[in-house]
Each structure stands twice: as structure tokens, then as C-alpha cells.
């Protein structure tokens, strides 16, 4: 069974992404150009059965830019115009598919910055955190130097 709470995305079952839109590879602390997105297989809509994408807090970084020059309070559900997601559930698991537009990352222009810092983990209340790479005891949830780089191509 899934435990997906948009008000508590850090603990919710889902695919969690950490993105740095201006990665330096030097700072051990997530800054204003870092974003954590929780792609939840359910928890949205009137019946809480719809998938959604939630901007979640990164430890030691509680505010992120909203795109309008102010900080956004977290957690914050991303609007469908910038993040579309679908999900499918089975008795023993779930699958999510998501498309994230550049607007999901305030202050990022893909034409100017084609390299992103990237990390991903599956969060599951029964199984714990399952990181893409690096052991669970590493500080990948808050330290961008533990993330890899994505090079975007045309």
C-alpha cells in the first residue's frame, strides 16, 4: 500500500528527485538553485487518488525561489502546467511517469545552463529510502557534492 501525503512529501512513498540548476560540485550545502521534487503515485485530487509532484524541503534549505522573486513555502504542489504525472498501482508496487518543464525549476534557463546536478531515490515506508547510487548513510539528501551531473542535449 502507498503512503502519500502532499503535506509531508519527505516521508511519502514516491520517486524523489534532487536537482541543482547551477551545480558547482563544490558546495556541501543545498542552496537556492537546488530543488527536491517528490513524484507521488497518489495523494492528489478530491479523493487523494491522483498522482502529483510536490516541491519538498531539502534539509538545511527550507525556502526555494518561486520564480516571482520571493521564496516559496514548502511543501508546494506543482501546477499541471509545469509538471504532468501519471501512475499505475499494483498490489506489490507502483509506477510513475512524469514530464517536468523548465518552469518547474525557477531561475533555470536550459539554453544557458545545459548541465544539472541530479540525484534520485525511491522512498517507501516499508522498504525505506532506496538511493539511485551511494549508500543510504551518505548525506545525499542535503549535499549536492554527492549528486551526479546530467548533460542535456538538443
Model-derived features: positions:
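Structural preference for beta-rich elements and adjacent junctions enriched in aromatics
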Residues: 1-154
Amino acid at each position: 500500500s502507498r503512503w502519500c501525503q502532499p503535506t509531508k512529501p519527505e516521508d511519502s512513498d514516491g520517486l524523489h528527485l534532487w536537482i541543482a540548476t547551477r551545480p558547482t560540485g563544490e558546495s556541501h550545502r543545498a542552496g537556492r538553485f537546488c530543488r527536491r521534487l517528490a513524484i507521488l503515485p497518489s495523494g492528489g485530487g478530491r479523493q487523494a487518488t491522483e498522482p502529483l509532484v510536490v516541491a519538498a524541503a531539502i534539509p538545511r534549505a527550507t525556502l526555494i525561489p518561486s520564480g516571482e522573486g520571493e521564496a516559496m513555502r514548502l511543501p508546494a504542489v506543482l501546477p499541471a502546467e509545469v509538471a504532468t504525472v501519471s501512475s499505475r498501482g499494483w498490489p506489490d508496487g507502483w509506477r510513475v511517469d512524469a514530464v517536468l518543464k523548465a518552469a518547474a525549476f525557477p531561475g533555470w534557463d536550459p539554453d544557458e545552463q545545459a548541465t544539472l546536478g541530479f540525484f534520485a531515490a525511491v522512498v517507501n515506508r516499508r522498504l525505506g529510502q532506496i538511493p539511485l547510487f551511494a549508500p543510504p548513510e551518505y548525506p545525499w539528501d542535503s549535499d549536492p557534492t554527492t549528486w551526479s551531473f546530467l548533460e542535456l542535449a538538443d
